[in-house]
Amino acid sequence: MTEKERILKKIESDTSRPVLFSESRGGSENQLRLLFKYVPDEFFKGINLILNNANPNLLEKDKINVLWMQHFVNQEEAKNLGSKEFVDQLDYIIFNSHWNFEKFQYQFKIPENKSIVIRNAVEKIEHHEKPNDKINLIYHTTPWRGLENLLNIFKKMNLKNVELNVCSSTEIYGKKFSEKYDQKYKSIFDECKNSNNINYLGYLDNPKIIELLKKMHIYSFPSIWPETSCISAI
């Protein structure tokens, strides 16, 4: 078993996580996949890499305990960072932005000497000429980040030469998550499907999103969510 396989096996078996890693294509999970793509396996030897879960049961005494925290400070999986006993057992805490680190330090007095910021990244997207027959807008993140607000604004504008493409679904976090939360946002998705000049595309995987972005003019994202390092905007 490689070091990366060992880490992934543990994350996959962590039942306290709200999503199953293998099914999820969320930002945090994709950042780990990107890290594993470019960093050699040998660099993870002796490392217990914990993803977004300040759960004391995930600590290992014989390894270097590294918590990679991409969640905002108010999330359930982050609360144990308020425990000095837990933080003392961590060797390093990685945050995805200086802003996010500052919020945790303010809330929980996280020690600076254990804190590292590694900002989020995406694969390079080459510049493409955009179509000029109409203006294409896109919303390509989860519904609770501002989709309802966007729909209200877009419908009131009622512009004939503008189309809104909505790529949003609870499916991004996998079957386990979708079965629990999809019904909550069904009315918003139905509104997208039944509105003029709105193309509801549901869940699209990352390569398809990137291809679609090449034709888009504006990322329409009236966010109501505390983004820690917004990958969809990057």
Task: Give, region by region, the residue ranges found by the protein language model.
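Carbohydrate-associated surface elements
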Residues: 99, 121
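Acidic donor-binding loop of glycosyltransferase active sites
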Residues: 214-228
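N-terminal pre-catalytic "stem/leader" segment of glycosyltransferase-like enzymes
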Residues: 1-58
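Nucleotide-activated donor-binding/catalytic signature segment of Leloir-type glycosyltransferases, i.e.
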Residues: 178-207
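Short acidic alpha-helix that forms the nucleotide-activated donor recognition element
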Residues: 205-216
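Active-site proximal beta-strand in glycosyltransferases
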Residues: 47-77, 91-95, 116-118
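Conserved donor-binding/catalytic core segment of Leloir-type glycosyltransferases
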Residues: 129-146, 151-154, 165
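Short alpha-helical segment that forms part of, or immediately flanks, the ligand-binding pocket
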Residues: 210, 228, 233-234
